[in-house]
């Protein structure tokens, strides 16, 4: 008798995706982040769903409703901090996942890569809107500053901003629509994840060597299921430690002050996971130029397949490219630090240098070094 998991129309899909899926035998721990992102998304949707049951999207009561969740709802504090710190874990996993793709040349699967970029943008938009919901000082001013950037778009900018705000400033209408979209977007993300996996399973996974692994495949279950479960346990250990011991470590104290349009905080800054992009935005002393640089800092990932000049796919056997890659990581960490600093000397000049270096490494140095490595190997 044939196993039901191989014949049932629904189970068959799951079987071909998670059980009998042929996977390369050499996948390292860097391939764990895809499944970790799935866990993060599930956790965010579940905690978010329960938070939404008690939250009120109204400027008069939003801040108090979050306080009510933390004080009066059974384990409300746990839900709230799991959701807030879960977002941080989500972005840590996202950036490591993208970094893995860059290092091992996974971007040559262009459809999977492009859907991944779309996912990144959607998750970033979702996180930004979520940060506005508690209606603290940083929520309000962050929303004001970031949405106001759209006014840099020529001709339609001002009308566009007022259309998004639903008025002449960030107010009740803005909060209501941000809550609506913050609730909706994770489900769009879940749908895009399906498309991402669909394209990935068309080609099969890449592996650390970058060499085709068709002759050497193993079933996903039990080998990678057990490996993924170990990853889940490690991530959930870190998350629960963060939530239970220092839940406000990654947050901003200003967000514990209710939103006040008449009082601007001394340093307006986004959550830590957007600081690198914020630093790039601030490093250009022109509004439109800054906005373009901000968008391009992520959109630059889309040209990676075109800029791949090496005859080898992975960086595993390319020490010069590896040096550039880790320099890029250092530059991104520098930008993250600069994004949280005030706009004054020497931070401004460091931010500008790091921003130039960021684009230079990806657009110019990496392709040049790849060509050089080809020549060194007489390819």
UniProtKB/Swiss-Prot annotation:
Note describing how the cofactor binds: Binds 2 heme b groups non-covalently.
Topology versus the membrane: Multi-pass membrane protein
Residues noted as binding heme b b566 in the record, renumbered to the chain: 97, 196
Cofactor: heme b
Binding positions (a ubiquinone): 201
Task of the protein: Component of the ubiquinol-cytochrome c reductase complex (complex III or cytochrome b-c1 complex) that is part of the mitochondrial respiratory chain. The b-c1 complex mediates electron transfer from ubiquinol to cytochrome c. Contributes to the generation of a proton gradient across the mitochondrial membrane that is then used for ATP synthesis.
Additional remarks: Heme 1 (or BL or b562) is low-potential and absorbs at about 562 nm, and heme 2 (or BH or b566) is high-potential and absorbs at about 566 nm.
Name of the protein in its database record: Cytochrome b
Gene name per UniProt: MT-CYB
């Amino acid at each position: 008798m044939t196993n039901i998991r191989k014949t049932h129309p629904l189970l068959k899909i799951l079987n071909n995706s998670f059980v009998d899926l042929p996977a390369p035998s050499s996948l390292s721990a860097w391939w764990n982040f895809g499944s970790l992102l799935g866990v993060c998304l599930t956790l965010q949707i579940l905690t978010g769903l329960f938070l939404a049951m008690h939250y009120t999207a109204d400027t008069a009561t939003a801040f108090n409703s979050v306080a009510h969740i933390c004080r009066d709802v059974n384990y409300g504090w746990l839900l709230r901090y799991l959701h807030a710190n879960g977002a941080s874990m989500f972005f840590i996993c996202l950036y490591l996942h993208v970094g893995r793709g860059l290092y091992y040349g996974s971007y040559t699967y262009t459809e999977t890569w492009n859907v991944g970029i779309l996912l990144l943008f959607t998750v970033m938009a979702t996180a930004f809107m979520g940060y506005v919901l508690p209606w603290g000082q940083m929520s309000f001013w962050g929303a004001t500053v970031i949405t106001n950037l759209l006014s840099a778009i020529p001709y339609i900018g001002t009308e566009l901003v007022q259309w998004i705000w639903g008025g002449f400033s960030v107010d009740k209408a803005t909060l209501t629509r941000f809550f609506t979209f913050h609730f909706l977007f994770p489900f769009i993300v879940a749908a895009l994840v399906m498309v991402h996996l669909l394209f990935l399973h068309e080609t099969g996974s890449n592996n650390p060597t970058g060499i085709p692994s068709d002759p050497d495949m193993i079933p996903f279950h039990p080998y990678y299921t057990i490996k993924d479960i170990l990853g889940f346990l490690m991530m959930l250990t870190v998350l629960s430690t963060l939530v239970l011991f220092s839940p406000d470590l990654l947050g901003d104290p200003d967000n514990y002050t209710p939103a006040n349009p008449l009082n601007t905080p001394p340093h307006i800054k986004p959550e830590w996971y957007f600081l690198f992009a914020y630093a790039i935005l601030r490093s250009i002393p022109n509004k439109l130029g800054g906005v373009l640089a901000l968008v391009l800092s992520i959109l630059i990932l889309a040209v990676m397949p075109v800029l791949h000049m090496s005859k080898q796919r992975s960086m595993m056997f390319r020490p010069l490219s590896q040096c550039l890659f880790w320099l890029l990581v250092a530059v991104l960490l520098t930008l993250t630090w600069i994004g949280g600093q005030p706009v004054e000397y020497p931070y401004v000049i460091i931010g500008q240098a790091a921003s130039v270096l960021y684009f230079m490494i990806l657009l110019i140095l990496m392709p040049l070094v790849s060509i050089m490595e080809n020549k060194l190997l007489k390819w």
